[in-house]
């Protein structure tokens, strides 16, 4: 089994010539390699809908984790229930932070996401995933190279120094149009916020709609230099 400790650069290759641009082959390899020792960390954005559909084909009983910060859009929570109905065998869990919002406010002050968003992300997303991955050898992410400069060198299989794990990214070669084409083709549920200017959807407090010519990440932490929650930092 390939682990963080036994990592070998470029030890695997996958054909990218099928409809899924290699994604299905990567997932088949991942679940054969790791079985129950892998989890998909899903934000339930539109890329997530594609991955959930593909994962369901490979392993309908796969574990999926949603990092519930307790400040997501109500549309996101509603979508999770629709996904549960569409893929009833998937093991979808909602991972809670160590602190409630009230406990966080008592300890760090009101509206931490405004005056220290990095700490807020650490408490409500990074530490919960870190706790979960302590018992796993690998995790799956919906990163695409097209999304941003910080993601353009992502590979199918990555040594993840942040979580000392293996990070699997099946959709690296997909474009925004290809993602939506797949969603429409398979009649997949998706967050209605995508239809009103939200290409990337995170916590309600830190996500804004973007203009017609904005990039897919422009609405996240708008007005600050922050571009990532920290899950994908190396």
Swiss-Prot record:
Binds 1 [4Fe-4S] cluster per subunit. The active site is at residue 229. Pathway: Sulfur metabolism; hydrogen sulfide biosynthesis; sulfite from sulfate. One of its GO terms (cellular component) is cytoplasm. The keyword Cytoplasm applies. Disulfide bonds: none annotated. It is found in: Cytoplasm. Its EC number is 1.8.4.10. Its cofactor is [4Fe-4S] cluster. It catalyses: [thioredoxin]-disulfide + sulfite + AMP + 2 H(+) = adenosine 5'-phosphosulfate + [thioredoxin]-dithiol. It comes from the Bacteria. Keywords: Cytoplasm, Iron, Iron-sulfur, Metal-binding, Oxidoreductase. GO terms for biological process: hydrogen sulfide biosynthetic process; sulfate assimilation, phosphoadenylyl sulfate reduction by phosphoadenylyl-sulfate reductase (thioredoxin). [4Fe-4S] cluster binds at residues 120-121, 203, 206. One of its GO terms (molecular function) is phosphoadenylyl-sulfate reductase (thioredoxin) activity. Belongs to the PAPS reductase family. CysH subfamily. Catalyzes the formation of sulfite from adenosine 5'-phosphosulfate (APS) using thioredoxin as an electron donor. This is Adenosine 5'-phosphosulfate reductase.
């Amino acid at each position: 089994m390939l682990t963080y400790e036994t990592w070998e650069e470029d030890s695997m290759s996958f054909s990218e010539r099928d409809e899924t641009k290699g994604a299905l082959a990567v997932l088949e390899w991942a679940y054969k390699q790791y079985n129950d020792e892998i989890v998909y960390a899903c934000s339930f954005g539109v890329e997530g809908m594609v991955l959930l559909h593909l994962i369901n084909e490979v392993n309908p009983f796969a574990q999926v984790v949603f990092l519930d910060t307790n400040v997501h859009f109500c549309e996101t929570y509603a979508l999770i229930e629709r996904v549960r109905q569409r893929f009833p065998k998937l093991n979808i869990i909602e991972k809670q932070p160590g602190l409630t919002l009230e406990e966080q406010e008592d300890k760090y002050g009101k509206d931490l996401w405004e005056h220290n968003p990095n700490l807020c992300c650490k408490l409500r997303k990074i530490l919960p995933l870190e706790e979960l991955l302590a018992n796993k050898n690998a995790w799956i992410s919906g990163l695409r190279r097209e999304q941003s400069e910080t993601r353009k060198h992502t590979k199918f299989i990555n040594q993840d120094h942040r979580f000392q794990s293996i990070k699997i990214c099946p959709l690296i070669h997909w474009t925004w149009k290809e993602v939506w084409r797949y969603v429409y083709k398979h009649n997949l549920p998706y967050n209605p916020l995508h239809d009103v200017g939200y290409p990337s959807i995170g916590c309600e407090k830190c996500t804004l709609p973007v203009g017609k010519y904005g990039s897919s990440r422009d609405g996240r932490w708008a007005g600050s230099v922050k571009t990532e929650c920290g899950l994908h930092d190396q």
